[in-house]
Amino acid sequence: MVFERDGSIAGKFRKMHIPDDPAYYEKFYFTPGDQGFEPIKTSVGTLGVLVCWDQWYPEAARLMALRGAEILIYPTAIGWESSDSEDEKQRQLDAWTTVQRGHAIANGLPVVTVNRVGHESDPSGLTNGITFWGSSFVVGPQGEFLYKAPADREVCKVVAVDMKRSEHVRRWWPFLRDRRIDFYSGLTSRFLD
């Protein structure tokens, strides 16, 4: 749910991609959203809200951008499973940050990513649970960091984002204009031969 300044509901988005990997067995509990990728118009701009696992799919970010999103927002709850090595933890965190910075660059839009912090035990007792890595961040339309939150504690921060800059970046790097859509039909196939 996205709320307007006066508390009214501006819109809603249902998570489209549901994970089923170690410590994240969400397919058992959730059904994928069925509303597609529609930005939400608000008094502060048009928001492309994508939830958690949706952040790994460039198609989702691109569809939001093509439909008029002025900023991408990713509310997230991601972390490390207890058996992950320190090297693996760093690789996962780097990949998570990089893919979303890539969405900003490829679409010429700022990205706001908010992530949970803290630890959640595994009620089954099969693992020691998940430690959420925090590290929320805001990047501009060229993927440049405007803010990075700490990994280990909650923070409430107002970050200034120059929304007009996206238009300039899109003129310098007209990725949306120069797409070869006449050759992208394979993107709607699960696999290609």
Residue locations for each model-derived region?
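Short, acidic, Ser/Thr-enriched surface-loop or helix-capping motifs
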Residues: 3-5, 139-140
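Short hydrophobic alpha-helix segments
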Residues: 6, 12-13, 149
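Ligand-binding pocket scaffold of soluble enzyme catalytic domains
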Residues: 10, 43, 158
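A short, polar/charged loop-to-alpha-helix boundary motif
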Residues: 15-29, 153-171
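Cysteine/selenocysteine-centered motifs that mediate thiol-based redox chemistry or coordinate metal-sulfur cofactors
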Residues: 36-70, 76, 166-193
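CN hydrolase (nitrilase-like) catalytic-core segments centered on the catalytic cysteine
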Residues: 46, 52-156
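Short beta-strand-to-coil "C-cap" segments at the C-terminal boundary of structured domains/repeats
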Residues: 141, 160-163, 187-190
